[in-house]
């Protein structure tokens, strides 16, 4: 919010200074002169020291979004085609690990056993479990049962029971690229209430993903998730 206010204030001051009546003693300036001065003093969105004049159509569009008050990503976080390929390969391993868990998870299994499945499969596929050792985190995955919200730590004394729902959160590093996803599992015969919760959550994910597209807004994704959850009585 603070950054947004700063952006709006700077835009207001800029426009006020440009639109105020000129002093009768100042030399007349053309609109072209005003535009050139504005371009000299406004830094490029990408952080370069070049003048604001857009270098590509992409830069022009980003600059326009910034002028409208939107927060725009710095060029440093934009990925090259090669980086996107690397992230996708890491994601393939991440999904393969979750598929491996799906093939073995069952009632009576401890969450520590799930953790070992994740560790062994990730290493077999050439990856590294990203959580392991991160800021002292002791395990390769996170397991959250029933009402546990997220990031539960696997343990030898926590076993799955028939009727549980459990989220397994997997993060993978492969060739220095990170990927992350989680999956909900229904253990045995779960109640209709739990099944409906899992189904609606998956539907929310799919609707949110439909909003992930070039020139879309991050808020559109969140709004799609929120609207669908609320429609079904969830928050």
Name these PLM-found stretches.
Residues 12, 16, 20-235:
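Active-site neighborhoods and metal-handling regions in enzymes and metal-associated proteins
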């Amino acid at each position: 919010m603070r950054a947004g206010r700063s952006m709006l204030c700077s835009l207001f001051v800029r426009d006020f200074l440009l639109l105020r009546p000129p002093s009768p003693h100042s030399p007349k300036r053309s609109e072209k002169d005003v535009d050139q001065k504005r371009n000299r003093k406004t830094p490029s969105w990408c952080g370069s020291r070049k003048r604001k004049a857009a270098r590509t159509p992409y830069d022009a569009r980003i600059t326009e979004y910034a002028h409208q008050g939107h927060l725009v990503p710095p060029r440093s976080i934009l990925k090259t085609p090669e980086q996107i390929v690397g992230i996708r390969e890491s994601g393939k391993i991440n999904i393969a690990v979750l598929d491996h868990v799906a093939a073995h998870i069952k009632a009576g299994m401890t969450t520590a056993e799930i953790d070992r499945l994740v560790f062994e499969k990730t290493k077999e596929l050439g990856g590294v479990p990203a959580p392991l050792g991160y800021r002292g985190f002791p395990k390769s995955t996170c397991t959250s049962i029933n009402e546990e919200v997220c990031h539960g730590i696997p343990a030898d004394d926590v076993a799955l029971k028939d009727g549980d729902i459990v989220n397994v959160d997997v993060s993978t590093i492969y060739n220095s690229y990170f990927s992350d996803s989680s999956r909900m599992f229904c253990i045995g015969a779960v109640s209709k209430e739990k099944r409906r919760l899992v189904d609606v959550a998956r539907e929310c994910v799919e609707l949110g993903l439909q909003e992930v597209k070039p020139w879309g807004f991050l808020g559109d994704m969140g709004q799609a998730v929120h609207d669908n959850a609320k429609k079904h009585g969830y928050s």
